[in-house]
Amino acid sequence: MGLADDKNTILVIDRSTDTQSVALVKDGQIFPRVFAGEDARSGDWPLKVRDFLASRGVAPGELDQIVVGQGPGSFAGIRAALAFAQGLALGSHAEVFGLPSTLALTRDNAKVAVVGDARRDRYWVTLYDGVHTVKDFFLVRKEELGGAVPDGFAVVTPDGHRIDSLLRDHYGPRYAGALTPLAAHLAEVAVGHPDLLRSEPLPVYLQAAVRTS
């Protein structure tokens, strides 16, 4: 996957869903890797990431940046990804940044509403115009979903296994379906829009019920 020329070597990690992924930005190219099923839940996941870097000829000390998807999503997954990134950065010059995982579901020149299950009969919503935030994360009740998304916005969710039918009922043809936030797409944002990177990243928590694992 090609990019505009970029000299930084960047590792991007997203563990906000059951489909967990990494991507390496090197020499203007994005190299993705997806861990699913047992690979995603395995305790040796950090070793698999190190093996992935080695397969691309990159030592942890050669990384310039590490970017982590901040969620919303799996409490354990996001925390583990941040801890891994901070540990990997120790003893190197790599900087650790964050991006909301929902940015992986945006597209250039498209208005997108990302809706997720916050549990306890609440749903989180965030609105984007391209990669730019129109309205940051906010919580709504089920009966408020219809009015939460303005006309002209397509609706997507990373939580299709839980709320796909609900969103179809509320949004009809505006509902574009379930999408998985992948590190490769976050890498595109990180390189194309470095101004969006967040230093000293923390997980996006909307309420305790967002913790999914």
Task: Indicate residue ranges for each PLM-predicted region.
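DPxDG-like acidic metal-binding loop motif
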Residues: 65-95
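Generic structural marker for isolated residues within well-ordered, non-membrane alpha-helices
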Residues: 49, 85, 164
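Phosphate/pyrophosphate-binding loops at sites that engage ATP/ADP/AMP, CoA/4′-phosphopantetheine
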Residues: 49-65, 148-153
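Phosphate-handling active-site elements
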Residues: 57-61, 90-99
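Oxyanion-binding and handling regions
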Residues: 1-30, 36, 40-44, 97-213
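A generic, residue-level signal for flexible/boundary positions that often mark functional hotspots
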Residues: 52-53, 69, 93-96, 195, ...
